[in-house]
Swiss-Prot record:
PANTHER family given in the database record: TR-TYPE G DOMAIN-CONTAINING PROTEIN, TRANSLATION INITIATION FACTOR IF-2-RELATED
Region (G3): 500-503
Transmembrane region(s): none
Biased segments, Basic and acidic residues type: 215-283, 294-310
Protein known as: Translation initiation factor IF-2
Organism listed in the record: Aromatoleum aromaticum (strain DSM 19018 / LMG 30748 / EbN1)
Compartmental location: Cytoplasm
Amino acid sequence: MEQMSVTQFAGELKMPASVLLEQLQKAGVEKTGADQLLTEQDKARLLEYLRRSHGQSQPKGKITLTRKQTSEIRATDSSGRARTVQVEVRKKRVFMKRDEVSAETGSLESAQIEEETAGLPMGEIEPTPEPENIVEPVAEAIPEPEPVREPEPEPEPIVEPEPEPEPEPEPEPQPEPEPRPEPEPATVESGAPAKPEAPVRAPSRPPLRVSILSDEERAAREREARRHQELRARQAADLKAKQDREAAARAAAEARRAEEEARVRAEAERRAEAAKPQPKEAAKAPAGTLHRPAKTEEKPAGKDAKRTARGDTAGESAKRRGLKTRGEVGATTGSWRGARGGGRRGAQDEHKSFQAPTEPVVREIHVPETISVADLAHKMSVKAAEVIKILMKMGSMVTINQVLDQETAMILVEEMGHKAFAAKLDDPDTYLESAEAHHDAAVEPRAPVVTVMGHVDHGKTSLLDYIRRAKVASGEAGGITQHIGAYHVETPRGMLTFLDTPGHEAFTAMRARGAKATDIVILVVAADDGVMPQTREAIHHAKAANVPLVVAVNKIDKPDANPDRVKQELVAEGVLPEEYGGDVMFINVSAKTGVGIDSLLEAVLLQAEVLELTAPVDSPAKGLIIEARLDKGRGPVASLLVLSGTLRKGDVMLVGATFGRIRAMLDENGKAIDHAGPSIPVEVLGLSDVPAAGDEAIALADEKKAREIALFRQGKYREVKLAKQQAAKLESMFEQMAEGEVKTLPLIIKADVQGSQEALVQALNKLSTDEVRVNAIHSAVGAISESDVNLAQASGAVIIGFNTRADAGARKLAETFGVDIRYYNIIYDAVDEVKAALSGMLAPERRENVIGLVEVRQVFKVPKVGTVAGCYVLEGVVKRGSQVRVLRNHVVIHNGELESLKRFKDDVKEVKFGFECGLSIRNFNDVQEGDQLEVFEIQEIARTL
């Protein structure tokens, strides 16, 4: 072996060289310098000294080896995903000397036997004090020379940590006692090499072994084994008794719970029997089925016993394998993972041991306006497949995501045995109702809202122009009103608010909105024209709204004016003047000259005084959207008539499915205002989208609540719209299958305001017939955009712009794609052109036109040609290729076509009246003399709507 210096050895031991030199000198090794070399004997002496000083003079009796092995396995977790788990296996092996093994298996009696052998020589007994480490009494009983060594541990407590690693590596490479394998083959490396006492220890063991295996020791071992066996048996008996007690307690608890449930059910059945006396036998049945819980008494106990036994076996096998586990992971409480299989079943059995026959559960289902099949199934707690089956039996083929309307859903719920209610449980509109109930502001008189109605061209706008001293009518396209206008006028007797409605038949919805918001209706009738269709419609609107009428007979300055005839016609419509005993005032006026205008205003104000119109002023505003449009620069603009309260700039408004904070308010002249009271018409800016004309507007204090209600309404309208579209698609599909293909004219309609848009769509849809149909793919308010052109190109539609124009990008795109864009300012022109286009799509009418009559004089049979008839033209003309009808005795026997026409031997195109000719009929040879041939042509005549 290589020798090393004191400095090198100190470096290995991680200690100063000076300290090591001191320890070497105390151990009897004469080393004075750090560069001197150390031999193996010097190291052994130092080791022996250190052991003596720390009370470990004797060699180690046992060696412990620990081995750690790490590996990886792939396992699935509770969610089913594969995971890599690191497994660390630690093995610990203890090697002991044979005499130590025998000493450990013995009890305290073995120590006494060793005391008896104390007469042996001291050198033989001295090497065997190993039992000292295990049994303390032996060390006290033998007066060994250990007390002499005890005073030596005083020096260097500092060195105590350093020499600890030294003894461990030292004993293993030196298995010096080679002569010993014969007496002790089981002994592995001894713990004390290089000791002079080691050879003396070998002969001392056989006599010691003989003394240990004596009869007394054997008897002592048997007694100890019996005692351990009795102890284990007693512990097993206690454990079994405890398990039996727990199982019996559980079984008793189950039985008590089952009896209690049976008693409660029997009581319920008895009460039900008292309420309806028919099912008497059924009520007795639960009381008689008390044998069922009795059966379940032993069942849990048996299962628990089996489970316990299984758990014990599993635990023992796990211990035998020596694997480190997380412990019991069965169905015990507090375990980190639920039990697999049986554990969960056991837990369920404890709770569900008793089940009485259940009656079908009848639920109260609140059905909204629209609901999907899946949501409805969830409400009824059934699978969606069951709902689809019932719907298929009812004749509807649906999918799980299909939306059902309220009526169908309620029928389905009743069909499945539940109770259906039409409900709006989560409707935030209830917030508005509760908010209205809390506002009890003082009411004040307000100005009347007057709507001017009548037939087109009867002078409504001209009448208002004279009252307002304005010239609106002269600036309107075509001289007709196509928008609803709102104006307020100050008169000496008070303020009046006028609504001017269109008179054209297409604007029915506008007139209905005007009647809804009004207090008084002025019915304008031209004295030279009388009562017309829209006049009658205006009367109906006024009566439906329960609004008083004032009739203005206009154009009395014309020569052919006849006010009395107008009165008679209105009486026929149920409008009685005051002079006839009615309650309607008739005023003769002329919007051109101003005759009777003051009398008309006085009559209106008188009627308003009778009505005593009032409205709260200091409260949140409520109003009605008269008209709405999309302005390119300002966004959505809504014309609003305030009905009650005061509307201020900055208020949060909720209008139908739109909301927003008012950024600006304008009066009818375009001037900015800050607030508007009752009966004042204003234009508001700041809404999130273009509202629908006729929607009710309300001012709210909470913008968050306004947004919530608007979004709810949007979702509701969308669901209803989708449900209607789906139904319409199915209906139209069946219609097309039944009637054949219907030609459609796809249109995209863009208008300046909402009212014009809906009026135009309605007027164009009225043009549809069974053969041709107008399909308004998209209709909206605003300018024609590129998205409209793209949609038109994809669907092959024509774009109609009513009082709007296409922007530059849209025009360029339309030229590229060849999309047709038509602009109109007058609704008549738009309707007429679409009508003409639909007429062109109609299949032409086929009409027969008889052009001649010929008589067969002679018949010739020509080979390879067939029958040729020699004829005389009695009337008209005969043309080659014309259709002919063969008449025999004035009865039609054949319809066909002329194949050839000849005069003498020449082919001719036609033969006129009074000439003879020869002809043959295609695929017909049964021509006889005396037959007459009627020659005709089929003309196609274009149809109109």
